[in-house]
Amino acid sequence: MTKLIIHLVSDSSVQTAKYAANSALAQFTSVKPKLYHWPMIRNLELLNEVLSKIEYKHGIVLYTIADQELRKTLTKFCYELKIPCISVIGKIIKEMSVFSGIEIEKEQNYNYKFDKTYFDTLNAIDYAIRHDDGQMLNELSEADIILIGPSRTSKTPTSVFLAYNGLKAANIPYVYNCPFPDFIEKDIDQLVVGLVINPNRLIEIREARLNLLQINENKSYTDFNIVQKECLEVRKICDQRNWPVIDVSTRSIEETAALIMRIYYNRKNKYNK
């Protein structure tokens, strides 16, 4: 496989550059990437340390840096080394400016990240953690989204992923022969989504979980008939209330969350008309 070095340089968490890099790398199955993360680069001293690393290990540079002087220093350095230096959002900003006729602001303040959206995300993450696995059901009215499904159908990581996108998500497990919370009998405004999975796949996941925890005596947890009934019952609950159901058998966490967000915003736009 072809080895490819990518340096991710950012004045924040490098997540934007990382997402862009991974999206692009998905198009190259024969590439073995090595990603170097250089977050919180906000002054020349820190940038010079990174430049020495880049000089030692040449590779493509992806960056998200607000400070104009730091950008100039980085791009000039890469130009002299004859290595690609790509602004992840630079082209987008330029096109927005050209299309709107609004001049790009020269002075940037790092406090731009700490706006309402930033704090909404923090609150959503806190909410997802506190309302994981059926906890604090008395606060479901504060949720944007409620996920229900059998154990190990990726409810928790999906809730957290939604939280990183500013949406408060609670998740409630469905366990065979156990009473389900009575919220399902009430008229609620929140979007409720059922997560189900192929029973055989779910058994594999649960067996791996039990092996990891070194638990041997929990036959019902991996019994095919019970697992199948759990998934069927979740479908039944959702069908009766016209709640959407997503089969996560072949979906990644990101794909599941993206589909949920699409449903959520379509629903929200419909009600806001």
Swiss-Prot record:
Residues binding ADP are: G149, P150, S151, R152, T153, S154, K155, T156
State the EC number(s). Answer: 2.7.11.32, 2.7.4.27
Annotated catalysed reactions: N(tele)-phospho-L-histidyl/L-threonyl-[pyruvate, phosphate dikinase] + ADP = N(tele)-phospho-L-histidyl/O-phospho-L-threonyl-[pyruvate, phosphate dikinase] + AMP + H(+); N(tele)-phospho-L-histidyl/O-phospho-L-threonyl-[pyruvate, phosphate dikinase] + phosphate + H(+) = N(tele)-phospho-L-histidyl/L-threonyl-[pyruvate, phosphate dikinase] + diphosphate
Say which enzyme class the record assigns.
transferase
Give yes or no: UniProt keyword Ribonucleoprotein: no
Q: Which domain of life is it from?
A: Bacteria
GO molecular function terms attached to this record? ADP binding; ATP binding; phosphotransferase activity, phosphate group as acceptor; protein serine/threonine kinase activity
Q: Does the keyword Chloroplast apply?
A: no
Q: Which InterPro entries does the entry link to?
A: Kinase-pyrophosphorylase, PPDK_reg
Keyword terms of this UniProt record: Kinase, Nucleotide-binding, Serine/threonine-protein kinase, Transferase
The UniProt function text for this chain reads: Bifunctional serine/threonine kinase and phosphorylase involved in the regulation of the pyruvate, phosphate dikinase (PPDK) by catalyzing its phosphorylation/dephosphorylation.
Q: Which family does it belong to?
A: Belongs to the pyruvate, phosphate/water dikinase regulatory protein family. PDRP subfamily.
- Protein name as it appears in the record: Putative pyruvate, phosphate dikinase regulatory protein
Source organism: Rickettsia rickettsii (strain Sheila Smith)
